Regions:
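Alpha-helical transmembrane segments
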Residues: 1-3, 52-57, 128-130
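Non-cytosolic membrane-interface motifs at loop->transmembrane helix junctions
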Residues: 11-18, 78-83, 147-156
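Alpha-helical transmembrane segments in multi-pass membrane proteins
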Residues: 1-35
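Membrane-interface elements of multi-pass transporters and channels
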Residues: 7, 34-35, 39, 67-79, ...
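Juxtamembrane helix-loop-helix connectors linking adjacent transmembrane helices
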Residues: 36-102, 120
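Alpha-helical transmembrane segments of integral membrane proteins, especially early/N-terminal helices
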Residues: 12-23, 49-63, 157
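Alpha-helical membrane-inserting segments
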Residues: 4, 28, 32, 60-68, ...
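Transmembrane helix-loop-helix hairpins at the membrane interface
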Residues: 88-180
């Protein structure tokens, strides 16, 4: 909430907060779920699948952006606000952080830890649904409807993929890293 809140966002650097959050979440997930990385397979197939998934999501979001802009007056300013967070920052640094830390850390936490453990406790379907809803609610603190809906759609896509193809977790991580 601190990173997105209209009240506090002017007092914190979004990218440093995301970096810190990514380190904490992925570190905690790794401590609580020791050895999770042993099942990762960064094969050529998973790399290609990750790229294809990211491109497919970009297509979905391109269409969604056009439709939302036609339907809602607030859509374009909210989307512009999301991309405006990159202004004044080193594009190389942001690309590095999103590719190698932030995107992968989100998947390690949300799918590799939260969804995996909720699925073990309540079954794969409920694990998917609950994780997707929590992922969306976390983004609601941004007070940005478009960001929250984007998180729900992307979270549902990655969650469904993890639900049915957990052995492709490396591809899911790659897709999130590229999509970011």
């Amino acid at each position: 909430g601190i990173m997105f809140s209209p009240i506090t966002s002017g007092y914190v650097n979004f990218w440093w907060m995301m970096t810190g959050s990514a380190l904490i979440l992925s570190g905690t997930s790794s401590l609580l779920n020791r050895g999770w990385w042993r099942g990762l397979n960064f094969s050529v197939l998973n790399i290609v699948l990750g790229i294809v998934i990211a491109v497919a999501l970009w297509g979905v979001f391109w269409i969604g952006d056009k439709c939302a802009s036609l339907l809602f007056d607030f859509a374009r300013p909210q989307v512009d606000n999301i991309y405006g967070m990159k202004e004044g920052e080193s594009q190389w640094l942001l690309t590095f952080l999103m590719l190698f830390l932030i995107g992968p850390a989100e998947e390690i936490y949300w799918r590799g830890y939260v969804q995996k453990n909720l699925s073990l406790r309540w079954g794969a379907n409920w694990g998917f649904v609950i994780t997707t809803l929590i992922y969306g609610v976390v983004h609601a603190s941004s007070c940005n409807f478009m960001l929250t809906m984007a998180a729900m759609v992307a979270g549902a896509a990655w969650g469904l993929l993890y639900r049915f193809f957990p052995e492709r977790f490396a591809a899911i991580i790659i897709s999130h890293a590229i999509w970011d």
